[in-house]
Design a protein with these regions (language model features):
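Bacterial extracytoplasmic/cell-wall-associated proteins, especially those involved in peptidoglycan
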Residues: 3-128
Length: 128
């Protein structure tokens, strides 16, 4: 999928404080209990999607795209946002990802590992 898309450069995207809040809280929901590297990786996947022509071109568009992130569909993200559950490390990871840092290359997906799925394993997720 990544090979079929065209990519914008991170310098072509500007993020708001609201984007930072949203991304940090998504990172909290998806990887709050993971090592810091796993938090950065989740943020990097979201930013990679923003930069890819295959996905929506805004951070909120990517996060709220139907069926993509489980905490959106379960209501967990809404609760985290209402209470600003994101930790300092989640905010640091969001800042790194929004500045273009990636420890997962151009990966645009992650999940819990399943047999036969090749990718980059960080914490309890595989990134691909």
């Amino acid at each position: 999928l990544a090979a079929q898309s065209s990519w914008r450069d991170i310098s072509e995207v500007s993020f708001t404080d609201g984007d930072r809040y949203l991304l940090a809280n998504l990172i909290y929901c998806e990887a709050g209990g993971e090592p810091y590297e796993g938090q950065v990786a989740v943020g990097a996947v979201v930013i990679n999607r923003v930069l890819s022509s295959v996905f929506p071109n805004t951070l909120s568009g990517v996060i709220y795209q139907s069926g993509q992130f489980e905490p959106v569909s379960t209501g967990r993200l809404a609760l985290a946002l209402a209470e600003d559950r994101a930790t300092d490390s989640c905010y640091r990871a969001a800042d790194e990802a929004m500045s273009g840092v990636t420890n997962v290359g151009n990966c645009v997906f992650f999940r819990t590992p399943i047999p036969g799925l090749e990718g980059i394993n960080i914490g309890g997720h595989v990134f691909y």
